[in-house]
Amino acid sequence: MDQHNAPEGRSELTEMRDMLREFVRERDWSRFHSPKNLASALSVEASELLEPFTWLASGDKSELDETKLVAIRHEMADVLAYLVMLADSLDVDLHRALIEKMALNRAKYPADMVRGDARKYSEYKAADNKADKNKADENKAAGYKA
């Protein structure tokens, strides 16, 4: 993210959180912002993000006119707002959460093993296990001990 608008020592994520806190406080909406309600609203907004892509052949950027791009930008802002508010309500540091999750993803999806392969982890892992079983069966048939 672009850091030049955030005050010294504060991230833009912190600025967004504070802006959202103020918006909610001014409207006395915090009583409605339970983690469950925020997660539900996040899901709704994420679904609304799909609407401008409906019925497009591929959904590539070249198919999106300015009106659709504005709608997408606004829905992305809604998704981000609810994500930041949900994280705030649960005391989740989104930066740290992303670092933690990326470490897990790197272990789960090693680049040399999955490059160019869009299958889910369980699918390629199952294929690897099947290949291992087939190799073991071949070795057994050839008289090798496992």
Predicted regions span which residues?
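Flexible "arm" and connector segments at domain edges
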Residues: 1-76, 80-146
